[in-house]
A protein has these predicted regions:
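Intrinsic-disorder/low-complexity detector
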Residues: 1-174
Length: 174
């Protein structure tokens, strides 16, 4: 199987698996809600996000994978709120006081406007954690050599799916 076919199949399988997890948690229905505007924003954030998250993957793999979903939620929130005004937000706006480390809390509290200890925030945290754990399991089952070109591309596809999942969750919440 050629690499691009492998990556496409991996991404499709992951998207379907994560959609099922979100459905089981009552966070999505039968398809991913999407917008080209939102999906395109990943392309501008991905280089900075990937540069930060790759450093965390060895010690905090679920965090490194999960935070892309929170970015998707933030972008979907902006898209709904006032896209013309908010579409050019720099990546740095997504980071909390501790940078990458508290990005999730910053997005939930300061962008989505939820109380961190509230039921909705906890539900979001649980589903994103479940998705990230499942994604990590899928990556590991592939038996790809760590730090290889193939590992990077699989990781990049994983992050893109997580971003889409987060965006879909937020669009569904609205």
């Amino acid at each position: 199987m050629d690499d691009s076919l492998f990556y496409n199949m991996f991404e499709s399988r992951m998207e379907q698996d994560l959609l099922k997890i979100c459905r089981n948690h009552g966070m999505l229905e039968n398809h991913l809600l999407q917008s080209d505007d939102i999906n395109d924003k990943w392309n501008s954030y991905a280089p900075e996000y990937m540069a930060q998250s790759v450093k965390e993957i060895a010690d905090y793999p679920t965090v490194a994978i999960a935070w892309a979903a929170y970015i998707g939620m933030a972008v979907a929130c902006w898209w709904n709120r006032d896209w013309d005004k908010l579409k050019d937000q720099p990546y740095s706006v997504l980071q909390g006081e501790r940078g990458f480390d508290d990005m999730d809390e910053h997005i939930v509290r300061d962008i989505l406007g939820l109380q961190l200890e509230g039921a909705e925030a906890k539900k979001i945290e649980n589903v994103i954690h479940s998705c990230a754990e499942h994604a990590l399991g899928l990556i590991r089952r592939e038996g790809i050599e760590p730090q290889s070109k193939k590992a990077f591309y699989v990781y990049a596809r994983t992050e893109q799916v997580m971003f889409k999942i987060g965006a879909a969750i937020e669009l569904h919440r609205l």
